[in-house]
Amino acid sequence: MWTKPSFTDLRLGFEVTLYFANR
């Protein structure tokens, strides 16, 4: 489990992008 804020932010951003792309 990574405790880096940058990694979490990047992952969240990627998920959001996929969500928007799926719309």
Curated annotation (Swiss-Prot):
InterPro entries tied to this protein: PQQ_synth_PqqA (IPR011725)
What Pfam families does the database record attribute to this sequence?
Answer: PqqA (PF08042)
- Highest taxon of the lineage: Bacteria
- UniProt entry tagged with the keyword Signal: no
Which UniProt keywords are present, listed alphabetically? PQQ biosynthesis
For biological process, the GO terms are: pyrroloquinoline quinone biosynthetic process
Cross-link Pyrroloquinoline quinone (Glu-Tyr) - where? 15-19
Q: In which pathway is this protein known to take part?
A: Cofactor biosynthesis; pyrroloquinoline quinone biosynthesis
Q: What does this protein do?
A: Required for coenzyme pyrroloquinoline quinone (PQQ) biosynthesis. PQQ is probably formed by cross-linking a specific glutamate to a specific tyrosine residue and excising these residues from the peptide.
Family to which the UniProt record says this protein belongs = Belongs to the PqqA family.
Protein name (record) = Coenzyme PQQ synthesis protein A
Whose protein is this, by species? Pseudomonas aeruginosa (strain ATCC 15692 / DSM 22644 / CIP 104116 / JCM 14847 / LMG 12228 / 1C / PRS 101 / PAO1)
Name of the gene: pqqA
